[in-house]
Amino acid sequence: MNIEKLSKSKYKIIGLVRTNVLRDLLELFDIRSYNDKENEIIIDNVKTLEKFHDWEKNQHPQINYLSAEEMFDNFAAISLYLEKIGMQLSHIDPTKLVVVNSNIFVPMNLEDLYIIKKKQITIDKPYSKDNNYLSLELQENSTIPHTVHFKSFYSSLALLIYDKLIGLENNTDYHEGLKVIFGSRLYWILRYCLLENAEERLIVII
């Protein structure tokens, strides 16, 4: 994935798949986009567009609670939309994640988007294990194809939010680490998203 700045408010992203779905995701956040070629998309009328890792460089190691809550709601809206059309991502890939206007996060790894069949998705493409936000079910997996519950994605989202709010390096016991935000909305959401049984996981937008 490459980003090319065309003008002050216009960007081109190259090396994409399923750009029709991507345009729908951008529309959730009132971001205007169009494409002339199948593997690229042009995003117009935005202040900034950058890769997630570049955005991270301008942040403190952790973000504040309200920012973390907004980040969760951002991804939850995307996740629920994808489920509505019968699809779900297997995981978040931080190397293929863009940030629009410094606070809108849009996954570009739609090659990792799968059709939900009987509440399951079958992952039939290789994925990198060098990813701190890999879904719990994929961390120890070594076989392709691999079938998981579509809510497997929720653990990937939870790990991203946990890392930006608390820090994955601070505690490998997620439930212990969450105690610093005990009683908050994110405490319960992240706890449910990190349940061992994927079918019991839950995301809620308020």
Predicted regions mapped to residue ranges:
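Conserved structural core of kinase catalytic domains
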Residues: 25-66
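Protein kinase catalytic-loop region centered on the HRD/HxD motif
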Residues: 75-88
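Activation segment/activation loop of eukaryotic-type protein kinase catalytic domains
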Residues: 91-133
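Activation segment signature within eukaryotic-like protein kinase domains
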Residues: 71-72
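ATP-binding glycine-rich loop module of kinase domains
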Residues: 1-41
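A conserved short helix/loop substructure at the end of the activation segment
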Residues: 194-205
